[in-house]
């Protein structure tokens, strides 16, 4: 009896310890999520309420203030709380989120609609790239503009200071964000606490502002002045920009910490600040130029400008990291050519740096800051890409609801229509700003969409053309077994995208050197529709005959391919792989445009240009350079 009670006590202590560790882990992840996930939406109060008020005509009346605030409250509730927190976050692809993850999930669930789903996914990804150059520009610029409230004499220095901060931000990317990321959470937590307290303090200026919780004021405002309200709706959307980050960063933190952080910290503090700004405007009358900073006491202005700048830099960092992550996914899914990837952490594989993407985003951001000069001007450019991306998410979510979750149409359709109508309304309200700055995000999105479409189309035509000219591997292997050429010791690995055909490098080797290795491996690398592939599913081996073997390596779209490490798994399957006796044969294609390619000449040239910029296969697949033999071939597409 005594032993049983001791065992019971020990079990209770163990369970308590496990529960405590789990709770601690959740709190740590919550803190991290505050910095990475909620940085963008958390800095929206700096400019969202101001822009929404300024979009409405004339002097701000009580009805206008309550109407605008009610629209913001219900936009946060329906789009973020209901759509993303309650539904979209459930659509994880093996724990990962984001447009391309959702696209892969939808394509797997509904193969018949694969092409249409791919097109929707491409649009969503292209729009994200448009967002990635606007977010750092408007966020940091809006924070530094707080200096104008401190003293108007600092106005000429706003743009130079913004450019300096952004230049430092992009220049330190190559060192990785691991060490700095440790302070992201605490700084952002302090930011939310500060904006919440500031809002709560001014809430007492006019407590009747809480009436804005009633959607009646939003509906009345929309109905009373439809034309002006339509423009205001486009500005109201600024309050929910960053909602997509909840889904994009799902794989970094998990659903539970993201949801808990939203309900316990982010949502309450955002509401308090927006209500505080509304009460401040009602109590003071007129039309404030910057209510977020103007409602602060003089002693708090400079500290808040500093904290706002830190918070917006963190928000920008999250978007830059997201651009790196999305680009890697696109490369793995063969939507873009290979791009150089540098790992900045030995512990966290997700922490990567892409020099070319970093440079392009930096140039885009700097040009926007110089060209537009103020966050108010940039606000017009901001909404289109984000609203478009959210609309793509809604469409893909419907496919997942119906085909993967097997929801009835009577349940899935009303929800999709609700989200779709709201997303479409915001999109249309922003599309009218296309000549005021919206053309920027549309141009970037169209350019990225064109690049991805050209790469997909070009690689498909190239694959079909080369396959028609290649000999079936089984036929060649059988003939070489009957009439063997001179055999040399060692193993030859031939990389190819088509494991059924004899690789070009193999044919050129036989033609010019008249020799064959004792063991020849036809190696192909494929990307799975899930983010990560376990080692047990990594390698597929197939013996063709005594001379040839097919090996297929599978990587998830979030993984960086490492061929030598993956081939080491083959030792457990019977193939004694030794890197020191293995030569890797790669075919380097020199492409030439052809009138019979199936694509217009301009697209041929664009595809050839993209192919030339592709990162070296040796480095990309992490093959030791001393073990590589490259054979050049010329191909007309």
Curated annotation (Swiss-Prot):
Subcellular localization(s) per the UniProt record: Cell inner membrane
Bilayer disposition of the protein: Multi-pass membrane protein
Main localization (coarse): membrane
UniProt region (Disordered), positions on chain: 1-21
Catalytic activity: K(+)(in) + H(+)(in) = K(+)(out) + H(+)(out)
InterPro entries according to UniProt: K+_transporter (IPR003855), K_trans_C (IPR053952), K_trans_N (IPR053951), Kup (IPR023051)
GO molecular function per UniProt: potassium ion transmembrane transporter activity; symporter activity
Family: Belongs to the HAK/KUP transporter (TC 2.A.72) family.
Protein name: Probable potassium transport system protein Kup 2
Name of the coding gene: kup2
